[in-house]
């Protein structure tokens, strides 16, 4: 079938799609056979009715089948959020990724430019001088030599060109916010995944379990698709097929609570300058929340036995300059491609 309309009608009637039907629908979208109106109608019908685990797994299958793959070392991790939380914070996962890389865990980071916010990972890294327009071999070199490689979503998911304009015009969250973190081109099995709403914490952990992930935390922190320092973070931790639920507070990281205003960022240039300032030694709320997310990532990757050890390793990555060196090497290696 190459017609999306029957699937639009089914979802609009509040019927759930099977994994096979969901995969077929998203293959139609990614092949370019659907019109922008059909895509927009389908995405919004899914959102209003609510996406199911089977629909997400099927959609991810369609994305993964078409993506451009990257080789990464065993034990690599991704630190990624769905976006779409509307909070306008700094690029927290980006700084956390540099801290983790500086602590010696390879990071295969997947991200994009801002679609429904002011600054995505790609916007900040581009402003810092990282070359985003590089191929899989060069990204693998970045991971090997800098400890961090950035996989620009539009480079690795070229089929998304059929969806991008519609997503921008809609200007709101869709299932594609959920799919991005699930379709890492390096096939990482360890991730810290932030989701834009608390109701997605458990379902995405289930999806990742079904997709074969090994060690993952899916988190939501009081409106943020990150571990937050503003209050309570909900966590679904997947380890070897078992999902455990718990909550975290800033005190679990040895941190004080802050207001959301303390975490507000700006555009790519603004956030890049703030990130560089932390690498240069600034101590502020942006640093602290990034340390918390890095600490959790180090625990997920098995480098730290608990969050406090993760915080110690993360702080050393900053204080020793290792995180800053990771960025400098990423800039150098990416521009030598």
Curated annotation (Swiss-Prot):
EC number: 2.4.2.18
Cofactor(s) needed: Mg(2+)
Residues annotated for 5-phospho-alpha-D-ribose 1-diphosphate binding in this entry: 81, 84-85, 89, 91-94, 109-117, 121
A Pfam family it matches: Glycos_trans_3N
Highest taxon in the source lineage: Bacteria
Record's function text: Catalyzes the transfer of the phosphoribosyl group of 5-phosphorylribose-1-pyrophosphate (PRPP) to anthranilate to yield N-(5'-phosphoribosyl)-anthranilate (PRA).
Protein name as annotated: Anthranilate phosphoribosyltransferase
Organism for this UniProt entry: Sinorhizobium medicae (strain WSM419)
Gene name as annotated: trpD
């Amino acid at each position: 079938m190459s017609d999306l309309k029957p699937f639009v009608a089914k979802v609009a009637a509040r019927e759930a799609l099977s994994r096979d039907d969901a995969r077929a629908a998203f293959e139609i979208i990614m092949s370019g056979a659907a019109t922008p109106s059909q895509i927009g109608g389908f995405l919004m019908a899914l959102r209003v009715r609510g996406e199911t685990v089977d629909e997400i797994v099927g959609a991810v299958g369609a994305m993964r089948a078409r993506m451009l793959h990257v080789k990464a070392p065993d034990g690599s991790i991704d630190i990624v959020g769905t976006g779409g939380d509307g909070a306008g914070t700094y690029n927290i996962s980006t700084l956390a990724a540099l801290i983790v890389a500086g602590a010696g865990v390879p990071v295969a980071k997947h991200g994009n430019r801002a679609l429904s916010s002011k600054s995505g990972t790609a916007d900040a890294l581009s402003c810092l001088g990282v070359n985003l327009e590089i191929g899989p071999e060069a990204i693998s070199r970045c991971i090997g030599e800098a400890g961090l490689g950035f996989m620009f979503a539009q480079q690795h998911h070229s089929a998304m060109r059929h969806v991008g304009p519609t997503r921008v015009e809609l200007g709101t969250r869709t299932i594609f916010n959920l799919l991005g973190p699930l379709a890492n081109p390096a096939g990482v099995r360890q991730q810290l995944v932030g989701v834009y709403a608390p109701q997605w914490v458990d379902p995405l952990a289930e999806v990742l379990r079904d997709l074969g992930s090994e060690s993952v935390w899916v988190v939501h922190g009081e409106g943020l698709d990150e571990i937050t320092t503003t209050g309570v973070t909900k966590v679904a931790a997947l380890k070897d097929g078992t999902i455990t639920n718990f909550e975290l507070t800033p005190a679990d990281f040895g941190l004080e609570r802050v207001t959301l205003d303390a975490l507000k960022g700006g555009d790519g240039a603004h956030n890049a300058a703030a990130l560089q300032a932390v690498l240069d030694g600034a101590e502020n709320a942006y640093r602290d929340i990034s340390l918390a997310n890095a600490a959790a990532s180090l625990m997920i990757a098995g480098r730290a036995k608990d969050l406090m050890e993760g915080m110690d390793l993360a702080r050393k990555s900053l204080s020793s300059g290792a995180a800053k060196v990771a960025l400098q090497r990423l800039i150098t290696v990416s521009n030598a491609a």
